[in-house]
Amino acid sequence: MKKQKIPLKNSLILLLTATIWGIAFVAQSEGGDAVGAFTFNATRNLIGALILVPVIFLLERLNSKSSSDTDNSGTNSTKTNVSKSENTSVSSKEDTRTLIIGGISCGICLCLASNFQQLGILYTSVGKAGFITACYIVIVPIMGLFMKKKCSPFIWAAVVLALIGLYLLCITDGFSIGKGDALVLVCAFLFSVHILVIDYFSPKVDGVKMSCIQFLVCGILTAIPAIILEHPLLSAFKGAWGAILYAGIMSCGVAYTLQIVGQKNMNPTVASLILSLESCISVLAGWIILGQNLTTREIIVCVVMFAALVLAQLPQ
């Protein structure tokens, strides 16, 4: 059987993504209390889209300059250049269509997932929300089977190990589950769909552009219930700007873009396992920044989750 290589560069990019997201749970907890869940998510996604606009223009300019230099050094005939130009035009239209479909699909998934998560965080702790969100490590490979995406025994073992960690953290008093936990569990399913949608589109389109479109779609869709249900006032933002800016610039603009780039040509189950480290980081961030209790049980869970990640990185 041919061994499956896991790109180290992609793994490190996704690890950085998980770190930013883990800290963002603190920002979501603080910001959501100040302005409302929908208002918080709408604002941070629109900020994320806005941040990526100059980045896209800069990358386009650099690519255009590089392409121009290549053309000037070439010696192709006029006939060949015309034929190439026609093919490029057709390909460009197809790429644009794929980009728009991918961006809108990701935006809808992100809108539903992030809003269920934000609402859930209002009724449960930052650390618990982080771990329940990480249930996508189980959902992704199961859904992937229907898409003919197979996983090695090492990866399945890592999923089981991570699931044990989630059980140790979340199920403390029997099998009862609170309102906030249920909302975040729905969010985990939706993030699983989001990961698989990215897995499908990321090799085909520009990751930064697709990320920008998804934020714009998510921000606009979330703004509708924010305006109708929460009636946001500018004065309410005064105590939440720090959290909103971190969530908008880092969690959205930087981290979600890194996710799209990092997931390119990567097994979605391995990607989900790396991203699930956000749960461990969210517990530590809640402990350090918010002063929330960090129990011995939660420390053990962090170790178990890290062991699952290491297991998933072994040569397949």
Question: Where are the regions a protein language model picked out?
Answer:
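Juxtamembrane helix-entry segments on the extracytoplasmic side of multipass membrane proteins
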Residues: 6-11, 34-38, 42, 94-99, ...
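C-terminal-most transmembrane helix of multi-pass membrane proteins
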Residues: 2-4, 45, 53, 57-61, ...
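Specific alpha-helical transmembrane segments that line the substrate/conduction pathway
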Residues: 39-50, 118-149, 187, 268-287
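Hydrophobic transmembrane alpha-helices of multi-pass small-molecule transport proteins
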Residues: 52, 151-171, 191, 222, ...
